[in-house]
Regions:
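Divalent cation-coordinating acidic motifs and surrounding scaffolds
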Residues: 1-153, 159-162, 208
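C-terminal "exit" segments of structured domains
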Residues: 139-141, 145-208
Length: 208
């Protein structure tokens, strides 16, 4: 998803300014008073940093309060007021969406007011996702309801070009010159995120 958003183009073929935030929810070690919701990153255009944070997330079970995390992100983040900008939330989970004190209807009302689309991703069977109220389109406007199998392995079909692409990417990274400590840090992060993608499978790494 980060890779796709990073390659987005406007109608006039210019590259838009992409900023993405990341929240974690449903982790029992997070604050109960905050609905087990924790902001990992506010809006940032550093997609390598975002990828690094995504790779570092792990799950340990807990109560998934969907309405709470949607509402929290809508209230805490500085969403642009312009109707011309694409504003969207992607939320993924595998428990009933009605859990918690903050109903998704309240969260969706806030989303509509701010012009934010809410796309839901249920990790499991499609019918079970509907039974657990993840098809929020009628409440949250024009958002989508998607189902994925989190246990399914990604088909990693090797091609004769994989090694060449990886080699050229390493050579390209070697042409960068860091400016100051911040630049050196960003170069190091870029290299680390490359390695994380390589560790998943070749198809993911090539798309990066």
């Amino acid at each position: 998803m980060v890779s796709v958003m990073g390659k987005a183009q406007c109608n006039n073929n210019t590259s838009p300014q992409i900023e993405i935030a990341l929240y974690e929810y449903g982790r029992s070690t997070n604050s109960k008073t905050e609905g087990y919701v924790k902001q990992i990153s506010g809006f940032t255009g550093d997609l390598d940093l975002l990828s690094k944070n995504l790779f570092s997330l792990t799950t340990n079970g807990g109560d998934e309060f969907c309405g709470h995390v949607i509402y929290t992100s809508l209230k805490d983040l500085q969403w642009d007021a312009s109707a011309e900008n694409y504003k969207v939330i992607f939320i993924a989970g595998n428990e009933d969406c009605l859990q918690g004190d903050v109903l998704y209807t309240k969260a969706c009302g806030e989303a509509k007011q701010k012009g934010v689309i809410v796309n839901t991703i249920y990790c499991g069977d499609s019918l079970q996702g509907v039974r657990e109220h993840w098809n929020l389109n009628s409440e949250c406007g024009s958002g989508s309801f998607t189902v994925i199998n989190q246990n399914e392995r990604i088909d990693d079909i090797p091609t004769p070009y994989d090694s060449i692409i990886f080699s050229l990417n390493e050579k390209l990274n070697g042409t960068y010159i860091a400016y100051g400590n911040a630049g050196a840090g960003m170069m190091g992060m870029q290299s680390n995120v490359d390695k994380m993608n390589y560790s998943m499978n070749k198809s993911v790494a090539v798309k990066r």
